[in-house]
Structure formats: C-alpha cells, structure tokens
C-alpha cells in the first residue's frame, strides 16, 4: 500500500483537493486516506494521471547507439509518462507482427513505461505495399504510420485508411509534401534567405494536410467503418486551420503538436545551432501562437514529444549535415507547465488533458481519471523549479535546446499500475 498525503488532484475533469490518495492492488483505493506501508508527503505538489506520448523514436532495433528501449523508457517515466507509442522507422522498420511482439515483450520485461508500438503502414516504409494490419493489431500495434517518411502515393494512403478502419486503427501521417520540402533545413522565409539556408516552406505542410483530408473524405465515403487520420507534429497556422475546418465538417481527424513547436521559433536558428534542426522545422511566431490557440479550442488533441535522439557527434555536425530531431521526453511537461501555465495562464486542467485523455482518445482508449477504482498509473509533480541539465538525462541524447532553462512541474514520482517506476522525492 502507498499513501500520497495532502496532494492536489488534477485531471481532465478539473482540479480539486487536497486529498489523501491510497493506492493498492494496482488501483486507487481511496481519496480519503488509509493505512499504508509507504507514505509520501504530497504537500505543495499535484497528482495527475500518467502521461501518454503518442510519438517517440526509441531507435531499437538497429540504432541503439542513439537510444534503446531501456534508456528511452527510463527517460519516459522520468518525464511522467506511463505509456508511450514508439515509431516504426527503425532499422529494419517495424513492419511485421514478429517485430511488434518482440518490442512489446522486451519492454514489458523492463518494467518501466508501457510500450505501445506503432507499426509501419507499408512494407519497409517504402510507400508501396501495405503491411498486414490485422496481424499487426493482434500483435499489439496501436496505430499505423510511415513517420520519418512522407506518404507520397495518395492511393496507398487511401487503401491504408480503408484497411485500418474496421480494425479501429488510426493512420498517422508525417504531413509534408516532399516536392515542396526538398532539402530545406529551416522554415522558408526572409530569415532563411538572410542566413543563406535552404528553406522548408509552410505550404509543404498545408498542401499535404489538404490532400490527406481529401483522401480521408474518400475513405470515409467508401468504408462502412470509420477511418481515422492523425496528423503528426503540426507546425503551421494554415495546417491548423485546415484541421480545424475538417473537424467542424465532421471528419474523423485528430492532430498533435510538439513541445518544440510550442516553445521555440525559427529565430533559434540565427546561431546556426543544429540542436534546433527538426522536421518539420521551427516556424514563425505567428505559427506558434496559432498552435497555442489550437490547444485551447480543441483543434489539437494531444501534445506529443516526437522525441528524436541522435548521438551528440551527429548533432554537432554543421546545420546542413546534422540529422533532424530533438529529444524531449524528460522535459516536455515541465517545459509546458512553465512556459504555458505559469507564464501565460494556460489552464492546468487542459494542459494535463493534452498529456492524458487527449492522446488516449486518439488511440480509442478510455479516459483515466483520479477516482476510486481507477488504475493507479499516476505522476506526482512538484512546482519546485530547477534548471534543465542534459548531463543528468536518462536518455542517451544528453543535450537539449532548453539546457539551462529554469522549469517547474518536474515529475518526482511515477507509478505504473501501482508500481513505483520513478522516484525523485528528495
């Protein structure tokens, strides 16, 4: 038995408390206390349901020098995540039931965050032949995506949506038009021109979202089941407007935004620092503000990290040669708690929802609330501030564009079904 005493409760339904949360047999037994072997003083802290990340690259199999299941899932629980969806763009890609099962079994044995593998939409993520979605779902895949690559063939995407619909699997898309994106390394515009860097235009995202929404309309018309499209790492004002319009029209589309697109802009590239190189690129302030509005009005369903670790040697190459990607599993919530909630008054209830029930809805999972009988997958968060120290990361990617930023809202206790998997109470 574990008792978390005198703690404020925050979930998608609101804030309340203080409460004395008694945990046993993997569940919340009471919000009014009781006898327990381990007592945690939650004074000044708040308790939330465990977070779910819809989008993380754990690099296993094939690139374990960058990250592996142990380091990635340990980073996850340190960040308050009890559940995580791993992307399939590994070496080789996760495109078979055997590969999905192998990941799930290894992750389960580690006893950290629960892994929910995404499987490739097409074999080898080549965009040609669809993978066996039914068998992948039976093996434990929770969505289909060729993330890391763009879906250039609209017919293949349509067939994938039609295949996934009766299985209840969402199809997630990296929405960029490859012909427009080309070799861009930052947002296309006056700053890219000034710096002499190739630009990736916002129209590349908007054009692909517009096309994919039309493909979704077709699949919806042709399928007796409901196809579900999920737009990954949305980064532009126009892309957001397209998703908003589609939702108002009743299309079954969901979307996510990342911590980096919510807190950073293209201005970070003025120093040519490759730590800020990411795909899609950091955009302008107008785009960032639009994303924040999208979080509030429900256009965006979830905050997803797009945790993308590389070796420091790779990220220290010049901006043209360094790989795309930012690691953020361990800082995502403190970053947004500080930058959005504390500094801008963003509602804490809504912020927690974007880390919990929002991503759960994308996957078709039931909500997880703080109530008697609920699964005790929980995170205790402290408002105490401290600077981001990448040298202390569990992730193998021990660097960060937010290094030195002073943040509050750090996870100090993470439980998965009643088991403590991370503790930093002192």
From Swiss-Prot:
Needed cofactors, names only, are: Zn(2+)
Keyword list (alphabetical) reads: Hydrolase, Metal-binding, Pyrimidine biosynthesis, Zinc
Which SUPFAM superfamilies does the record cross-reference, listed alphabetically? Composite domain of metallo-dependent hydrolases, Metallo-dependent hydrolases
- Sites binding substrate sit at 57-59, 89, 310, 324-325
The record ties this protein, via PROSITE patterns, to:
DIHYDROOROTASE_1 (PS00482), DIHYDROOROTASE_2 (PS00483)
Q: What family does the Swiss-Prot or TrEMBL record give for this protein?
A: Belongs to the metallo-dependent hydrolases superfamily. DHOase family. Class I DHOase subfamily.
What's this protein's name?
Dihydroorotase
Whose protein is this, by species?
A: Thermus thermophilus (strain ATCC 27634 / DSM 579 / HB8)
Q: Which gene encodes it?
A: pyrC
């Amino acid at each position: 038995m574990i008792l978390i005493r005198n703690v404020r409760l925050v979930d998608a339904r609101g804030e309340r408390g203080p409460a004395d949360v008694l945990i046993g047999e993997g569940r919340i037994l009471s919000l009014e206390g009781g006898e327990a072997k381990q007592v945690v003083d939650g004074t000044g802290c708040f308790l939330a349901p465990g977070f779910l990340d819809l989008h993380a690259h754990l690099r296993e199999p094939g690139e374990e020098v960058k990250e592996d299941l142990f380091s990635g899932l340990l980073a996850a629980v340190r960040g308050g995540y009890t559940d995580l969806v791993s992307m399939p763009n590994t070496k080789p890609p996760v495109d078979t039931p055997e590969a999905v099962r192998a990941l799930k079994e290894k992750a389960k044995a580690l006893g950290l965050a629960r892994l929910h593998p995404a499987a490739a939409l097409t074999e080898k993520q080549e965009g040609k032949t669809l993978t066996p979605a039914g068998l992948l779902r039976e093996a434990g895949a929770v969505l289909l995506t060729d993330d890391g690559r763009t879906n250039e063939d609209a017919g293949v995407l349509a067939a994938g949506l039609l295949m996934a619909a009766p299985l209840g699997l969402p199809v997630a898309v990296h929405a960029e038009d490859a012909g427009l994106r080309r070799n861009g390394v930052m947002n296309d515009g006056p700053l890219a021109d000034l710096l002499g860097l190739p630009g990736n235009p916002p129209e590349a995202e908007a054009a692909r979202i517009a096309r994919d929404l039309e493909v979704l309309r077709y699949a919806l018309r042709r399928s007796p089941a409901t196809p579900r499209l999920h737009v990954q790492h949305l980064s532009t004002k126009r892309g957001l407007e397209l998703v908003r319009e589609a939702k108002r029209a009743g299309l079954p589309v969901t979307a996510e935004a990342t911590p980096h697109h919510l807190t950073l802009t293209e201005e970070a590239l003025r120093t040519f620092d490759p730590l800020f190189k990411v795909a899609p690129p950091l955009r302008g302030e107008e785009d960032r503000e639009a994303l924040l509005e999208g979080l509030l009005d429900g256009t965006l369903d979830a905050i997803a990290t797009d945790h993308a670790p590389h070796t420091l040697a790779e990220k220290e190459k010049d901006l043209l040669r360094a790989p795309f990607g930012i690691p953020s599993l361990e800082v995502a919530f403190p970053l947004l708690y500080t930058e959005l909630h504390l500094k801008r008054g963003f509602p804490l209830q809504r912020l927690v929802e974007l880390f919990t029930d929002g991503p759960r809805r994308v996957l078709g999972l039931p909500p997880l609330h703080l109530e008697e009988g609920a699964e005790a997958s929980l995170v205790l968060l402290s408002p105490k501030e401290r600077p981001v120290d990448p040298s202390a990361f569990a992730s193998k990617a021990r660097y960060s564009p937010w290094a030195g930023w002073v943040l509050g809202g750090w996870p100090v206790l993470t439980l998965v079904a009643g088991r403590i998997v991370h503790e930093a109470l002192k």
